[in-house]
């Protein structure tokens, strides 16, 4: 899980979602998981 000011899709499997007011990237590749903070 990377915590970043700006979250971006890294590959085509990445999805940007908003969960409890937090922007997250979920992906089948665990390295691509990010959240905004």
From Swiss-Prot:
Write the record's keywords in alphabetical order, separated by commas. Answer: Ribonucleoprotein, Ribosomal protein
For this entry, list what GO says about its biological process. Answer: translation
What GO cellular-component annotations does this UniProt entry give?
A: cytoplasm; ribonucleoprotein complex; ribosome
Family annotation (InterPro entries): Ribosomal_bL36, Ribosomal_bL36_sp
Q: Name one GO molecular function term.
A: structural constituent of ribosome
The superkingdom listed in its UniProt entry is Bacteria
SUPFAM superfamilies assigned to the protein according to its UniProt record, in alphabetical order: Ribosomal protein L36
Q: What's a Pfam family in this record? A: Ribosomal_L36
Disulfide bond residue pairs:
none
Name the protein family.
Belongs to the bacterial ribosomal protein bL36 family.
Q: Know the name of this protein? A: Large ribosomal subunit protein bL36A
